[in-house]
């Protein structure tokens, strides 16, 4: 994985929230996703861009 794409700016994490739960997100480096524990969803990051659509998110129980 490209080093540049495997990081998320901490300031971005402070601004972004889960669109479903409005809860905080954490970065999962292994899967390159933003995770909402509250909604149990993981949002993918593609080409360095977080895809904050519930329809694109992966359920954590999968």
Swiss-Prot record:
Database matches in Pfam families: Trm112p
GO CC, one annotated term: cytosol
Lineage top rank: taxon: Bacteria
InterPro entries, per the entry: Trm112-like
Family per record: Belongs to the UPF0434 family.
Protein's name according to its UniProt entry: UPF0434 protein RHE_CH03977
Native species: Rhizobium etli (strain ATCC 51251 / DSM 11541 / JCM 21823 / NBRC 15573 / CFN 42)
Organism placement in taxonomy: Bacteria, Pseudomonadati, Pseudomonadota, Alphaproteobacteria, Hyphomicrobiales
